[in-house]
A protein has these predicted regions:
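Binuclear metal-dependent phosphoesterase catalytic core
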Residues: 2, 17, 88-93, 109-114, ...
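Core catalytic region of metal-dependent phosphoesterases/phosphodiesterases
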Residues: 8-91, 195-198
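Divalent metal-coordination and catalytic microenvironments
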Residues: 10, 31, 36, 63, ...
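Active-site environment of divalent metal-dependent phosphoester hydrolases
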Residues: 12-17, 38-43, 64-72, 104-107, ...
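Conserved catalytic scaffold of divalent metal-dependent phosphoesterases
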Residues: 13, 66-156
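Cap/insert and terminal regions of metallo-dependent hydrolase folds
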Residues: 38, 51, 55, 139-177
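Proline-centered loop/turn at the N-terminus of a beta-strand
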Residues: 57-59, 82, 133-135, 170-171, ...
Length: 204
């Protein structure tokens, strides 16, 4: 079953971006928010209520601007929102793993340790012979793609890059680097997407 997935990043409370999201969401089956939807958690509750009002499943990870505990609490209160920090969610043949990766370092040892749970889940599902596509939701983009480039320098996560390559992740939806927004790139077998605040839609 093909799903229309709308992914968006780094909204930072922009009313224009939220209005665009509300229009685009009408055509989506699932919405994925890859962090930094606020500025330092300002107006976090009304923004998340707008996400909830989309009446679609909305998967959210935090970026460096959100308070994770507050986001988790609101996700628990709002019926359409799913808190995805270090969480796995399966929909049909899609295995989705969310992680609020550190956007300010090349190496993220916490991610390298915790992401092994996704590797275990992939192995179990493959043993059953089920067709499977994997999506990593990461605030930090993988190192060495259009998604993490500022001028001529790459500043993404080498931990995310290595994980995607080693485990043949199908899609990596990311954000954080505003200069890399609205880009799609390929990292070996992984399609890397930094959708920016106006979002991008994919049929998967």
């Amino acid at each position: 079953m093909i799903m229309r997935i709308l992914t968006v990043s780094d909204i930072h409370g922009s009313h224009k971006a939220l209005e665009r999201l509300e229009k685009s969401a009408k055509k989506a089956d699932l919405i994925i928010v890859t962090g930094d939807f606020t500025i330092l958690s300002n107006h976090i509750e009304p923004i998340m209520k707008r996400f909830n009002a989309l009446k679609k499943k909305v998967m959210i990870i935090t970026g460096n601007h959100e308070n994770s505990n507050k986001v988790k609490l609101l996700c628990n209160q709002l019926t359409n929102l799913y808190f995805m920090n270090n969480k796995i969610f399966q929909i049909n043949n899609l295995l989705i793993y969310g992680y609020n990766t550190n956007g300010f370092s090349f190496k993220d040892e916490r991610f390298e340790r915790d992401s092994l749970k996704l590797v275990s889940a992939i192995k179990k599902l493959k043993k059953r012979g089920a067709p499977l596509k994997t999506i990593l939701i990461s605030h930090a983009p993988p190192f060495g793609t259009k998604a993490d480039k500022i001028m001529d320098e790459h500043c993404g996560s080498k931990s995310v890059r290595d994980f995607c390559i080693k485990h043949d992740i199908n899609y990596c939806f990311c954000g954080h680097i505003h200069e890399g927004a609205h880009t799609v790139d390929k990292l070996k077998k992984t399609i890397v997407v930094n959708p920016g605040p106006y979002g991008m839609m994919f049929e998967i």
